[in-house]
């Protein structure tokens, strides 16, 4: 898991932070904010990651989903757009060793029961609702974007925890607060009370807790 201490190692010229967790409502997708690819900054895959946590009666599982691609269009501290791609086959399970159930859980999560990674190998998040003139990055408290999981795209609003900038080389780090999405909104049905009755205690919570750290190169 990428430590949020890594963020504080940057020299801050703009910053803001807060704590808390929020349940995120999903709405219909909207047009993504246009970016200038030539002026966009590559996300540092080795220093960026999404943390996930799932819940069931009497327990939980957690892990990471590494970033496989992504760019942020930031010019002179102004954000114009961006996107992040995550490959599901890179998903990790951190609270179980591979030989004690970690590999089995990963295989199940990637199967047709859950995310059907063979058919839908990537998760995509693309920023929306940014005006043509952009927004000052240091002033942001949330990010709006289209989250595509399987064959469903929904717009969500993610609360931010901190934004850190290095004035010397325009390196940026953006971290979110912990937030939850409802997997039923993306038709992830296995063990869900939203789709099945009579599960008793053999259900898995619809809410998935997420948080992320994105750093640019």
Predicted regions: what they are:
Residues 14-217:
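Low-complexity, acidic/polar, glycine-enriched regions of mature
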């Amino acid at each position: 898991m990428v430590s949020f201490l890594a963020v504080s190692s940057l020299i801050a010229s703009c910053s803001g932070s807060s704590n808390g967790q929020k349940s995120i409502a999903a709405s219909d997708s909207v047009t993504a904010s246009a970016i200038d690819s030539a002026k966009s900054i590559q996300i540092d895959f080795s220093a960026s990651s999404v943390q996930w946590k799932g819940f069931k009666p009497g327990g939980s599982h957690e892990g990471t989903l590494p970033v496989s691609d992504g760019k942020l269009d930031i010019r002179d501290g102004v954000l114009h757009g961006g996107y992040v791609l995550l490959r599901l086959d890179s998903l990790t399970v951190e609270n179980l060793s591979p030989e004690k159930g970690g590999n089995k859980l990963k295989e199940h999560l990637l199967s047709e029961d859950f995310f059907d990674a063979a058919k839908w190998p990537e998760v995509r998040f693309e920023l929306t609702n940014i005006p043509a003139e952009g927004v000052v990055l240091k002033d942001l408290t949330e990010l709006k974007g289209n989250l595509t999981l399987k064959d469903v795209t929904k717009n969500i609003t993610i609360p931010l925890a901190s934004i850190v900038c290095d004035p010397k080389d325009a390196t940026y780090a953006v971290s979110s607060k912990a937030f939850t999405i409802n997997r039923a909104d993306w038709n992830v049905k296995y063990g869900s009370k939203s789709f099945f009755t009579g599960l008793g205690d053999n259900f898995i919570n619809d809410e998935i807790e997420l948080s992320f750290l994105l750093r640019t190169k």
